[in-house]
Amino acid sequence: MPSKFFLSFISLSALVLAGCGGSSSAPDLAVSDIAVNQLKYGQLSQFTLTGNFSDNEINVSTKNCKGLALVAGGTTTTKSVTCTIGAVGTGVVSLEAKLADGTVLKSVSFDVRNPQVSMQTSLGAVLLELNPTAAPLSTDNFLQYVNSKFYDNTLIHRVVTAGIFVAQGGWLTPTPAVQPGQKAAIALEVNKGLSNLKGTIAMARSADLNSATSQFYFNLADNVALDTSNGGYAVFGKVVSGAEVLDAMANVKTTTAFGLADFPASNVVVLSATQTK
């Protein structure tokens, strides 16, 4: 849904001009440019409006950018607002500045790419591309954990290569101990056009369909049965670089340790996970 924020810009230059003997009338209001510092899905972006701001009220509205707020400060020629990017696609995010009477001063649209996450592991680097269009709940949930650094220095604690072929993580530290900071569980997202094929990432959960929190798994082979088995498991992205790292995970030796079966005999560590796009 579009969001709106009303900005009352006071032009100090107009007051100065009048005091210096210049024209006492305010200069014509204009917005010559709207620039943005970053366009990462799910993250806060800052839009800077450049122009000539008088004491007229400006209506700034956005599409697919949530939580619009005015940045404190600014000058007589620049003002900034922030909001959180909420969609991906071509021209999907827009910002428009107009007068109270509806006169449009400037309208700009921006492209937003699918979010990507760089995951550094003890076996190498993996680059993930997520799909918020098909799986918004799972994508947003995963990115919240990524951006809070929850996954940094955690284990791939389960590698299964019989029946299903998965490498699961997002739960334990190398101690091992349960990583603190889990968020509320999310609803299951299945039948979204995504399948548990080799190289995809999906949410792990318990028998409760709506119990996924921080744990995820990589599909080390085609596991299409997981699309429907026990209600299905939600795929939300894929590996776009580093497939050899998943192959290396599939070849690790496992044991039973700490009450867990299929536990890697040597630690496989997620060193860091960072949203890059």
Feature locations, PLM:
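Bacterial N-terminal signal peptides that target proteins for export
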Residues: 1-9
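Cyclophilin-like peptidyl-prolyl cis-trans isomerases
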Residues: 20-277
